[in-house]
Amino acid sequence: MIFKQLIELYDLLDSPSASGAQVVDYLRSIDPACDAETYVLEGPKGSTDMVRVRIPGSRGRTAGGDAPTIGLLGRLGGLGARPERIGFVSDGDGALCALACAAKLLSMHARGDVLPGDVFVSTHVCPHAPTFPHEPVAFMGSPGPRPR
């Protein structure tokens, strides 16, 4: 089950100071050798921390094999819309689920349960996403650049 990882990451992400660095530190507490990185992506309405994790497979490209690679993308506007909306908001579920999957796969990998193919997980951590007016509730935006 993935409940432990969901609860731990929810606790980590439900904070106005949540960051990509905190997420990477959490993932490295599970597997110190994990391939995880974070970087800041600046946009017209602020910034967000991008997080990328690679879990190598036993026969994946990382190991020189031919097993298929899968990518999990946690899409969202942001974890929070502070100060307009206090606390973790529903747009954060994409990041939470993607990162919980990464944490579970890293835990399995560290214990010897290795999937055949590589798994990539990517999302962003933004506790202060911009909003724009909409009734009855404002819509979430994203500080990053718009997709082309």
Which role does the model predict for each range below?
Residues 4-82:
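Soluble metallo-hydrolase cores and metallopeptidase-like ectodomains found primarily
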Residues 16-23, 91-95, 144:
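Generic structural signal for well-ordered, non-membrane alpha-helical segments
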Residues 72, 82-123:
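Alpha-helical metal-binding/catalytic segments enriched in His/Glu/Asp
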Residues 136-148:
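A glycine-rich helix N-cap at a beta->alpha junction
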Residues 23-31, 101-109, 147-148:
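Hydrophobic, Leu/Ile/Phe/Ala-enriched alpha-helical segments that form helix-helix packing faces
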Residues 76-79, 123-130:
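Acidic, glycine-rich active-site loops and adjacent beta-strand->loop/helix elements
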Residues 44-45, 59-66, 89-91, 111-115, ...:
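Solvent-exposed alpha-helices and their adjacent loops that cap or buttress functional pockets
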Residues 84, 130-137:
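Short acidic, glycine/serine/threonine-rich loops at helix termini
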